[in-house]
Amino acid sequence: GKTTTGVETFADQLATLRKIPFEQHLKSLTWLLKNYGRQKRRLKKMMNWYAKGDIQQLYKAAKKDAKGMRRILLYERNILMTNRFEEIAREQSLFCAVGAGHLAGGKGMLRLLKKAGFKVKPVQLG
C-alpha cells in the first residue's frame, strides 16, 4: 500500500543528456565499443564494490567516468534529487534509492541530506 515516486524523472534524465554535446556522446560510445572487454571487467569490479557497500570507490569511478561533465552528470542531479527527496520527506516517510555514484563525495547526496538536517544511515541488505 505504499506510493512509489521518483526523485528524478525520465524527462530530467533526458534534459541532462541534452546538455551534453552530440560529439561527446559519440566519443563516449565509440570508446565503449573499442574497449568493451576492459569495460566489462570494470563493471564487475563496480558490482563488487556495490555488494560491499563501498560507496567511496563507486563515487570515484563515477567521478572518473564523468570527467569534465561532473557538474552536469553528478552535481546538478544530486541537488535536484536531494531537493525532491526533501519535498517528499516533509509530507511522508520514504525509502529512496539512487545510483550509488550519487551518494558519496563533497557534493554527494549523503552530504547534502545531512546539511539539510536529515539523519542518514546505511541499510544492510541480506
What are these regions (language model features)?
Residues 1-90, 108:
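Hydrophobic, often amphipathic alpha-helical segments used for membrane interaction and targeting
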Residues 71, 75-126:
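C-terminal soluble interaction/assembly domains
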